[in-house]
Amino acid sequence: MDSIIQNDTERCFLCGMIGYVEPLDKHHVFGGALRKKSEEYGLTVYLHHSRCHIFGDNSVHKNARINRKLQAFAQKKAMDHYGWSVEDFIKEFYKNYL
């Protein structure tokens, strides 16, 4: 499914720069066992591979604060998009990130 969070898949969701600066990766906001649900519900964003996704100081995989902010933002988007309550979201993703 297309992302319900990000329309412009040619720009990094975190820094806003175009992908030609560095390749973009599709990041599933809720990973691990919830990766398929992230895909199913469109909870994905595009991030610069090194700087914003994996290795940078402010990348989602190295900076827990940034990752949690993205998860909270994605939860709000999902609740708005699907008309879910917090309880509905927890039924799908097992946790409240707000």
Residue ranges and their predicted role:
Residues 33, 64, 72:
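Small/polar glycine-rich anion-binding or flexible loop at a beta-alpha turn
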